A protein has these predicted regions:
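Ligand-binding clefts/hinges and TM-proximal coupling segments of bilobed small-molecule sensing domains
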Residues: 28-36, 163-180, 217, 249-276
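Ligand-binding cleft/hinge of the Venus flytrap
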Residues: 58, 62, 74-83, 146, ...
Length: 276
């Protein structure tokens, strides 16, 4: 899920990271040998920095093994590159500094390609969408229009401090906005009839319905209320790797594998992606 505060933590590192780039660039140079066309830290192994705490996108399963959408996609990537995959699980705030310090080849944690981050790393094209939708009880017949939901009679829930909370207030200003510190509590408020709708990411609705007998449904708006995208990050200067990553994403997007992986792991339909 996209917390506004989650990404702010990395901003404090920008100045230090920028200085680190200069140090690393002077201290060492990448190997451009024919046997290492993507300039990997260890030839033959793709080392990826992750923060495995965001189920179902990326997490540790019951056996302590990396799992989720990102992991399935990375395994397909490593297979296509004919290399081994090595995942390093770190705190979120250590990912970009670690990438700049060449502790791994890329970061896969659904990063938004913000101007601040672009100063220190290079991004691939988007590989994961974060679609905010509105969900209602399955027996609710409220039309899927902004006008119908932007009404003083409606109460709409969201996760406290999230993009969803901002969307509720911006898109439905006449409705009562009710935010919760716990995502499940926001869902249950609607499922039990104490609220009318919830703004949430589409895959989180799918996860809730798995264990709650499909008590909620997505309101049939023509498109999501809002879509953000996450990209892979690589070290600045490694054009060969970022070019391959973007090409791979386009390939699996066009052949349907991306949608298959998303449905398999997220339990939801892949939202619209930028065209290749």
């Amino acid at each position: 899920m996209r917390y506004q505060g989650k990404w702010l933590a990395v901003v404090a590192f920008i100045a230090a990271v920028a200085a680190l780039i200069v140090t690393v660039a002077v201290a060492s140079a990448r190997s451009h040998a024919p046997g290492n066309p993507y300039n990997l830290k260890t030839p033959g192994t793709l080392v990826v920095g992750m923060n495995l705490q965001y189920k179902p996108e990326m997490y540790l399963d019951s056996n302590g093994q990396p799992a989720g959408y990102d992991v399935v996609l990375l395994k397909a990537l490593a297979k296509a590159m004919h290399v081994k995959l090595k995942i390093q699980n770190l705190d979120f705030t250590g990912l970009i500094p670690g990438l700049v310090a060449k502790k791994f080849d890329m970061v896969s944690v659904g990063l938004s390609a913000t101007p601040e981050r672009k100063k220190v790393v290079t991004f691939s094209r988007p590989y994961v969408p974060y679609a905010q939708i509105l969900a209602q009880r399955t027996d609710d017949t409220t039309p899927a229009t902004i006008a119908a939901w932007n009404d003083s009679s409606k109460t709409i829930t969201s996760l406290q401090g999230s993009t969803a909370e901002q969307l509720v207030k911006k898109t439905f200003p006449k409705a009562t906005s009710k935010s919760f510190a716990d995502q499940n509590a926001a869902f249950l408020e609607v499922a039990t009839g104490r609220a009318d709708g919830i703004v949430v990411e589409n895959y989180l609705l799918a996860q809730f319905n798995k264990s709650n007998e499909k008590k909620l449904k997505e309101a049939a708006f023509p498109k999501p209320l809002h879509v953000e995208y996450g990209s892979w990050a690589v070290q600045k200067g490694n054009g060969a790797l970022v070019k391959y990553l973007s090409s791979f994403i386009c390939k699996v997007q066009k052949n349907g594998q991306l949608a298959k992986f998303y449905k398999q792991t997220e339990g939801a339909t892949l939202p619209p992606m930028p065209s290749c």
